[in-house]
């Protein structure tokens, strides 16, 4: 059955021809693939199913020849193109015309207005840059479906995401699309899922605190369900929850501890499966002084009491310097310390301390005999390691170091991370930290040496290095110097011109003698070094700047599932920019993973990312400063502040021109606009004042490091 519904007989030649058409420049056997496809044909088989079958056969052959893997992705991409509309506007119109529209009114109207320029800039050939498994992942969960049938192409999705982030600014949208479609970066999964939709929840990471009460516990569980429903990954810290056997004053009873509560979290994660696209995921963070620590370490194990198991949760520990110091002493043969466990109800405050303050309070409670129990620290450590070996968790984070190097010291103590343990932000039961993420693809930022000038190579017939050098060059003029006397004259001439002794071939020169722009390369080894690919740091910095603008937009456009998330994001405006493809990059640069050059490159990469992001963040703040320091803004802000004086300042935003301002930003502006010290920071996020960066401390300062590749201009 063809894609248009017409029935016809299957012909081997047609199957083979389709395979052959898609196998340009591939070393594969179209006949073999066609034979295997035809051997599995049944009555009523659809053409699209034949393509699926052919792609699966190719993937089974890719271990013998990697070109079959390339053919597999060409087949599935071609099949997707045959099943979907090549017009972006028509595809979006289809999504919008559903009974419950899949894209927002704002996005649809923006597309209608810019239809022609959008269609002109979309490039469907870039779909073929995605491999088989990449496309299948996108097809399964990311590309929009109607009645179970995929209607989007990869480029449709990328353009939708870009337009959804930059409604009203077509140039910024097309620039963002260009970067994404060329695979310089990708946005986080929720952004790809929901950008441009009616409920655009675009954030990946949520960090949640829990209050030790029935209302607090079940509110947190409900909030986790709402966040998970919209594809958010969650980290919850539960140190404040009292332990098993702890007294409950309200009922004159005893607490059952954290495990029964965690079982509710576990079932919630299983039930609320992110809109059917992927499983809900929650990580639970605990400090090792909690009395339920031993039971906590067992919850993911495959044996034991089923009532004590929560295998769909991830576990994590926030370890202190004190714990690690006592552990180190025990491992190195000192007296083994009996680690004390304290109930949060009887011994409050430990989870809100770090460093020396934590140590002081810990020993204060210990001396007051408030410990619920004590356990040899080596025994506890072995329990932790055993759990990691068996289940892969708990994650281990170091609370003191996290807080020492935090730019949120002016806000509070960081007590947990997120689901994947790469984001550290302040959170409590009043504000849930969240972060919008994006990932830069380093492997797509490699520059190959492009030789577009004349190349002259002096060689001799029986020279293996000459032959090897010619294989490296795309084009060249070969000057064969087999005569020994002629070679001696050549060596003398080159030695005179270059001011150094030349006594071997090959010798490679690039350029035009007439224009006198000849560049001497050298021999075979020098040519290899000359042609070596390099990393494009300029592209890296430009990518960072595009991402900062995009993620800043995400904060304002996002649909927040609960007000605590909005409060946190509007106050702190955190951005999470990371990398992928590091090993692929090293392979392309021909750098060993453990080499000194790799270590230096790693540092240089992250220095460039850090400073480029800071620079663009500063530029955004300056743009806002220039808007906020006008007389017109002062009049507008005064009216807004007076009219909404009873509103929560961190939950309400107002649009002025193309920018959005929270009521808190407006209040800060009105309070400090004439203050010579704080007034200059108007335009920054509201909790910037008092932060380490506000006081001139960069992240590397907090780590007691200095930049190695970028000049510190302070």
Regions found by a protein language model. Give the residues of each.
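Local sequence-structure signature of Cys/Sec-based thiol-disulfide redox active-site neighborhoods
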Residues: 392, 450-481
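Non-catalytic, surface beta->alpha helical segment in thiol-disulfide oxidoreductase systems
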Residues: 510-533
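Alpha-helical elements of the RecA-like P-loop NTPase motor core of helicases
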Residues: 294-295, 467, 471, 492, ...
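Residue-level detector of beta-strand face positions
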Residues: 142-143, 507-509
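Amphipathic alpha-helical protein-protein interaction segments
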Residues: 8, 254, 459-462, 483
